[in-house]
Amino acid sequence: MKIAVEGCCHGELDKIYETIQFLEKKENTKVDLLLCCGDFQAVRNEGDMKCMAVPMKYRQMQTFYKYYSGEKKAPILTIFIGGNHEASNYLQELPYGGWVAPNIYYMGYAGVVKYRGVRIGGISGIFKSHDYRKGHFERPPYSKDTVRSAYHVRSIEVFKLKQLKEPMDIFLSHDWPRSIYHYGNKKQLLKKKDFFRQEVEDNTLGSPAASELLLHIQPSYWFSAHLHVKFAAFMQHQNNVGEIPKATKFLALDKCLPHREFLQIVDMEHDPSKPECLEYDLEWLAVLKATKDLLNITSKTWNMPENNGLHARWDFSMSEETKREVLDDLGHDIKIPCNFSVTTACYDPNNPQYKRMPTHIVNPQTTEFCARLGLVDLNVKVRQHEEEKEDFDMTEDNEADSIGSAEDPGEYSTDTSILSTSVNPDEITLEDDDEQEDEGIAEKLGEPSPEYTPDLSVNFSNIRVLPDSMAVSSDDATDSTNDELDRSESSQTEGEGKQSNRPLKRMSNENGSGGVKIKRRNQAIYQAKDDEDE
């Protein structure tokens, strides 16, 4: 089975599908599945754009709305995770995952699915320590703070993923696992992105939460994006005595722009007896059921259960009996139903509604999913909490009028002052102040990076300092780290044997025999300072 892996989408669905179709015709092959590693930008209308953390002048509708309305249909089954430039209000409707359009599936805050026997896991968002232990409390209309915190990874998702025991074939994250750069060609990476140097040397680049998952899950492949550079690494895991050694092939890809390495084809073994449809993963569903009482929908910090004598249960890994119970709940049908439905008005280019406000809808897909498994819809719970809070505030106001009290309970206040240090009003790129690249630029200019803010309340006990013997020195003279993934085991770039093993770049003047001309519609926006600000 051939799987296309794409880095940051940035709403360029048409261009990505055109590129894959061009490749299929050129190489006389067929791509079975597309995986997108975040910044998908499933924007349906003008209200959704207001929920996307990008500078105002870069808010563009792009073409997803055509796939949402049914004007177009994705030619390839597409699975994606969220990044840090998303229509968060829409993705928030599907906390457990679901169809954002026909043939386009979102994995939720975290999730695991199967396709033709290949097990695919993923986690959405990027890591920020100050929001990590909070709940998913955000809801539209977002403030300037919550429009960013909405896409920050939460500890509950990492905790649930760490309960998994069955082997994982593919795992997706938007930001890189911290320390993964020690397993690839750092010299070549820093040649392309010199402003990463200090963070690489300090071992602060990337997500410690993703690194913890990498050490626990040990998937065969791990794909990421976010830093807008192609980078390959090979990590041999340290296993216990008697266990079969495992290794992970890591690949990060660029964003969808001309002359950029944003797409790669990977060959994967699959089960030909399995149907060509997306299926639920029983172990993951069992974990969701077991951890439903751990949900936190407030901005208060919340510690996950540990084996420290304070919790009655801390191990939520699943037995075969529990998975059979989930199978019974599903009526022994693990196929993910194609139950997409339009839930809001779609953008009309002939009648734009710039004053349209964001919507916060209880999606029928989530309602159906929760009903089948006895889960809690986070959107319903957040809405109920807001209503209760409003009633409480009204009561407090009435009491204040009668007794002269000016006390404010402030239950929903969120301290995000840390974000203010990285605001760059002159930024002319899609990246907002939360992007690690911009933080690297700040380092280059001699300014303190806001990314590495020690938070002693967050304990990543499983993150280890990588041994020198397993790290690739930044002085290594490897010709191309981008070939490492291709050389390891059976992974191949599409077209191997016919041409050089290099990932597909989209050329702005590229024309194949089929007459496909691939040129980015909004390319002019990025040309001026693309290389220095990416």
UniProtKB/Swiss-Prot annotation:
InterPro entries for this protein: Calcineurin-like_PHP_ApaH, DBR1_C, Dbr1_N, Metallo-depent_PP-like
Binding site for a divalent metal cation 2: 39, 84, 174, 226
Function of the protein: Cleaves the 2'-5' phosphodiester linkage at the branch point of excised lariat intron RNA and converts them into linear molecules that can be subsequently degraded, thereby facilitating ribonucleotide turnover. Linked to its role in pre-mRNA processing mechanism, may also participate in retrovirus replication and have an antiviral cell-intrinsic defense function.
Residue numbers binding a divalent metal cation 1: 8, 10, 228
Enzyme class: hydrolase
Acidic residues bias spans: 388-400, 428-439
GO CC terms of this entry: nucleus
Free-text activity regulation comment from the record: Active in presence of diverse metals including Fe(2+), Zn(2+), Mn(2+). Also activated by Ca(2+). Binds two metal cations in two adjacent alpha and beta metal-binding pockets.
Compositional bias segments (type: Basic and acidic residues): 484-499
Subcellular location: Nucleus
MF terms (GO), sorted A to Z: metal ion binding; RNA lariat debranching enzyme activity
The protein's name in its UniProt record: Lariat debranching enzyme A
Pfam families cross-referenced by the UniProt entry: DBR1, Metallophos
Annotated keywords: Hydrolase, Iron, Manganese, Metal-binding, mRNA processing, Nucleus, Zinc
Family to which the UniProt record says this protein belongs: Belongs to the lariat debranching enzyme family.
UniProt lineage: Eukaryota, Metazoa, Chordata, Craniata, Vertebrata
EC identifiers of the protein: 3.1.4.-
GO terms classed as biological process: mRNA splicing, via spliceosome; RNA splicing, via transesterification reactions
Necessary cofactors: Fe(2+); Zn(2+); Mn(2+)
UniProt keyword Iron, yes or no: yes
Chain spans, region Disordered: 386-439, 469-534
Biased composition (Polar residues): 413-424
Cofactor binding comment, as recorded: Binds 2 divalent metal cations per subunit.
Stretches for region Lariat recognition loop: 124-154
